[in-house]
Amino acid sequence: MVIQPSLLLLLLLTLQDVDSCQGPELVRELVLAKVKALFLDALGPPAMDGEGGGPGIRRLPRRHALGGFMHRTSEPEEEDVSQAILFPATGATCEDQAAAGGLAQEPEEGLFTYVFRPSQHIRSHQVTSAQLWFHTGLDRKSTAASNSSRPLLDLLVLSSGGPMAVPVSLGQSPPRWAVLHLAASAFPLLTHPILVLLLRCPLCSCSGRPETTPFLVAHTRARAPSAGERARRSAPSMPWPWSPAALRLLQRPPEEPSAHAFCHRAALNISFQELGWDRWIVHPPSFIFHYCHGSCGMPTSDLPLPVPGAPPTPAQPLFLVPGAKPCCAALPGSMRSLRVRTTSDGGYSFKYEMVPNLITQHCACI
C-alpha cells in the first residue's frame, strides 16, 4: 500500500495541532489549558484596561444585559419606580352619547362616565399615589359661588353591586381644572383590567376638545418579593451556566467502563466564566468541547484505510507508517468551528468572531 505524500503531510500536521496522544489520565486542567491556547491563538488576547488588568468594563443599564445573563455586583440596585398616565379607553364626543364606555353627560345630574384600562405594568406593581385630572371649565368665582353644602365633585366607581363612592381629596390645580387625589384605600382599583369611573359635577359642562380630555396619573413601584422569590434569589448560583447539551450528557444512560478504554470522542462542558473570560466572550456563556481520548490497542497490520466519506470506527485504526504506534486523534477535515460574540468596552460594541477547528466531530486511531 502506497500513501500519497500530500495525505502523509496532512496527517502529520493534524497530529501536531491536536496533541491527542495523551495517557488515560487526561485531566480537566489539561483540556482547559488546551482550549485557552486555541482561543488565544484564534482571537488574540482580550483588550485590557489600564487598572484592573481585565477586559474594559463599563456599567450598562439593565436593559442592555445579554440574554438575561448579568454580571452581579455588590452595588445596590436602583428602585423600580415609574409614573404612568392613563387616558380614557374610548374617545366618544359629547354628541355621541350612545358610544359604549365613552364620555357621557346626563344634564340633570352632571354625571360623566370614563372607562380606563390600566396596563399590565401598573397592575403588576404597587400603586403609591393616584390622581384624576378633570377639566371643569369653571373659574374660581364660579367655584366659590357654588353651594358649599354639597361638594363640587363626587367620584364613584362602577362595581358589580352598582356605583360606589371613591374617597378623594381636592388638591392644587391649574385654572379650570380639578385634581382629585385618590385615597390609599382606592389604589387597588387600578389592579383591575377595566376601571369605570363616574364623576358627578352639576356645574360642569361637557367639552369635546382633545386638550380637555381627563386622565389618571399613577405612581408605582415594584412589589416586595414573596418568600418563595426571596429564597430563589438567595440561592447560591452555579459555578458555571448549564446548557441543554450539558443536561443531555447528565441524563444519558451509564456506559460500561470498558467503553472509555479505547479511542472515542469525549465531551466536556466549559464555561467562559470558568476560564475567566465571561466579560470578554459574552455569547455563548458555555459550550460543549469534544475531543479524542482513549488508547489504540488493536493490532496494526493488514487493516485498510477507511472509505472516503465514512468516518472510521474507534476500532478501525489508520496508520501513517507500517509498524508505527497508533494514536487516538481527530479525523482530518472533521473539525468544527465555534462562533462567539466578544466585547472589549463592557458591552457598548460587539464583535462576531470565529474560532476555527475547535470541536472534534470524529475520532480515529491514526
Swiss-Prot record:
Q: What is its main location?
A: secreted
Which chain regions cross the lipid bilayer? none
What keywords does the record list, in alphabetical order? Cleavage on pair of basic residues, Disulfide bond, Glycoprotein, Growth factor, Hormone, Secreted, Signal
Q: In which tissues is it expressed?
A: Mainly expressed in ovary and testis. Alpha- and beta-B-subunits are the predominant forms found in testis. Also found in placenta, pituitary, adrenal gland, bone marrow, kidney, spinal cord and brain.
Hey, what's the signal peptide range on this chain? Answer: 1-20
Q: Which cysteines are joined by disulfide bonds?
A: C263-C328, C292-C363, C296-C365
Q: Name the residues of the propeptide.
A: 21-63, 64-233
- The glycosylation sites are N147, N269
Q: Which domain of life is it from?
A: Eukaryota
Q: How is it modified after translation?
A: Proteolytic processing yields a number of bioactive forms, consisting either solely of the mature alpha chain, of the most N-terminal propeptide linked through a disulfide bond to the mature alpha chain, or of the entire proprotein.
> Which Gene Ontology molecular function entries are recorded, alphabetically?
cytokine activity; growth factor activity; hormone activity; inhibin binding; protein-containing complex binding; signaling receptor binding
Q: Does the keyword Transcription apply?
A: no
User: Where does the entry annotate site (Cleavage)?
Assistant: R63, H64, R233, S234
- GO CC annotations? extracellular space; inhibin A complex; inhibin B complex; inhibin-betaglycan-ActRII complex; neuronal cell body; photoreceptor inner segment; photoreceptor outer segment
Check the record and name the SMART domains matching this protein: TGFB (SM00204)
Role of this protein: Inhibins and activins inhibit and activate, respectively, the secretion of follitropin by the pituitary gland. Inhibins/activins are involved in regulating a number of diverse functions such as hypothalamic and pituitary hormone secretion, gonadal hormone secretion, germ cell development and maturation, erythroid differentiation, insulin secretion, nerve cell survival, embryonic axial development or bone growth, depending on their subunit composition. Inhibins appear to oppose the functions of activins. Inhibin A is a dimer of alpha/INHA and beta-A/INHBA that functions as a feedback regulator in the hypothalamic-pituitary-gonadal (HPG) axis. Inhibits the secretion of FSH from the anterior pituitary gland by acting on pituitary gonadotrope cells. Antagonizes activin A by binding to the proteoglycan, betaglycan, and forming a stable complex with and, thereby, sequestering type II activin receptors while excluding type I receptor.
Fill in the subunit field for this protein: Dimeric, linked by one or more disulfide bonds. Activin B is a dimer of alpha and beta-B. Inhibin A is a dimer of alpha and beta-A. Inhibin B is a dimer of alpha and beta-B. Interacts with TGFBR3L; this interaction regulates female fertility.
The entry's family comment says: Belongs to the TGF-beta family.
Q: What is this protein called?
A: Inhibin alpha chain
